[in-house]
Amino acid sequence: VYTMQLNLSGIGKGFCADEGTKILQDAGQKYGYYNLGASSMVLLSDPSHRDTGWSVSVTSPRYFSDSMSYATLRAHDIVLSTSGDYEQYYELEGTRYCHIVDPNTGYPIGAAPSQSGSYVVCATVIGGNAAAGDARATALCCMTLDEALSYSRAHSSEFKVLFVWYEALTNEYIAYSNLENWTLEE
């Protein structure tokens, strides 16, 4: 007997990050950072790097090199939210089935026959509040490349993004960002 359970708790960690930030700031906390399972992170000021902020590495969805990260950014007084197919998944007959279900297809992202295996494998949203960032990062993973680019550009004044698109036809990974202060790891 197989059992399956769906929940909509994808923004739960972001909501907790937002509420935790309020509590810490109300208590006078000005410095530091904290994360909730690495997918929701709050960066307050860094007293040792006041101008540049914290150095944050974004985990690589496929470990492109010896490094486990694919990008590094410097930031402070901001939230980051990440979604992707690389931590909660299984593979069956060469297809990856992850925990993010595309509401348009009913399949996990990248697994729908109509997608030809091309999809956003991970997305990080920087700015806004963490709950909205969690929702946006997950939504980006369910978009086509054109949709993700259009959405990111249309909302660039509200938040920044960093995402990786997997193109199955050419077996390439393409990183995109509208951030100014990030570096791609070689």
Identify the function of each model-found stretch.
Residues V1-E186:
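Mature catalytic core of soluble alpha/beta enzymes
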